[in-house]
Amino acid sequence: MEERQTFVFSATLTMVHDIPEYLEKKKRKHTKSKIQKLTPAQKLQKIMELVGIKNPKIIDVTKKSGTATNLTECRIACTIDHKDYYLYYFLKRYTGRTLVFCNSIGCVKRLATLLGILDCKPLPLHASMQQRQRLKNLERFQADENGLLIATDVAARGLDIPNVEHVIHYQVPRTSESYVHRSGRTARAQKDGITVLMMEPSEKEYYSKLCKTLGRTEDLPMFPVVDRLLIATKERVEIAREIDKLELKCRRDNSKKGWLRKAVEEMDLVLEEDEENLAAEMEETATLKYQLKKKKHQLASLMSKVLFPKGFSGKYPDVNLEYKLNDDNQKAIDVMKKVIEEIPKKEKERNKKPHIKRSSFKTKILRKKNRNKV
């Protein structure tokens, strides 16, 4: 038998973190002993035993940060309701191949529907899809230089998609490994890339654990967003949400009516109030369709206009100096790099400001008394 070599590669082989709460609770039911956190060496040993490798040679080139040096990391802090605004803002403001990660299939489906209504041409990818459809969406994503793929962690590993410029974590990943592998879809083959972590208040705990595991002593820098441009996206997203709700209601009503009519026909039943109910149903359906048509017309009217206006604004001159609107050459990574470069300068300027010592209330009274005596 010829000699055979087996190689095992991973960006997170030596990464260790605290045991997730759900796993700790599950283990407590079966054992009373406390679960010990593995060291990197112990973790590697267990992997070698599972794989069945004899006399392994370990080469660890993992960096402390866990991510590539040419990857720019940042975050957006917002409420859960505003995530859609920020995501749509980013997609419309910065062109390029973008991969959006979600924690659940339900979230992927919702975003794909919403962004589809907004004409962003999203391509969903999750485990519930047929393999043929998954491969088809991946091919479409690779063929479009401004492609948008919305996926679960099924796309976080094992995929080498060239020239992915942006990775957006729509939800904070539950583990540090997921964050590293998701972010690793960009900044590949010595190319630059940017990863944006969207964080709501309830996800702060997962964010803190992520920073702790990756050895981050400081928060990820904030991605710059022009507030007045963000406001322009809100109206579109809100109308798209309403359209989504109306379409869902129409589908449910049609499904319910179809099932009821089919059951009545199969059992040869005659409903006394059939005509009255039918008239009421038709009126309700007509109302829903009218509302849906009205909202679609309203959205189409907004979509026909320029989202981010060109030119100089006299009301907000400082905004125009800092951010050029509708600049096709403007890249998200360049904007973020500029912000990161300015952070030390701003801190230095802040430290240079003279500290004004405020006099206490008692000192003021004494000074007043002394003036009166004079």
Q: Regions from the language model: what does each represent?
A:
Residues 1-3, 19-34, 113, 117, ...:
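Arginine-glycine-biased low-complexity disordered regions
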Residues 138-157:
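Conserved two-lobed SF2 helicase motor
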Residues 2-7, 97, 121, 144-148:
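Loop/turn-to-beta-strand initiation segments
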Residues 65-117:
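Conserved interdomain hinge at the start of the Helicase C-terminal
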Residues 103-137:
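Conserved helicase motor "Helicase C" RecA-like lobe of SF1/SF2 P-loop NTPases
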Residues 8-13, 62, 102-105, 152-154, ...:
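A short beta-strand-to-loop transition that corresponds to the Sensor-1 phosphate-sensing loop
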Residues 1-60:
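Post-DEXD/H (motif II) to motif III coupling segment of the RecA-like Helicase ATP-binding lobe
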Residues 157-172, 193-198:
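A short beta-strand element within the Helicase C-terminal
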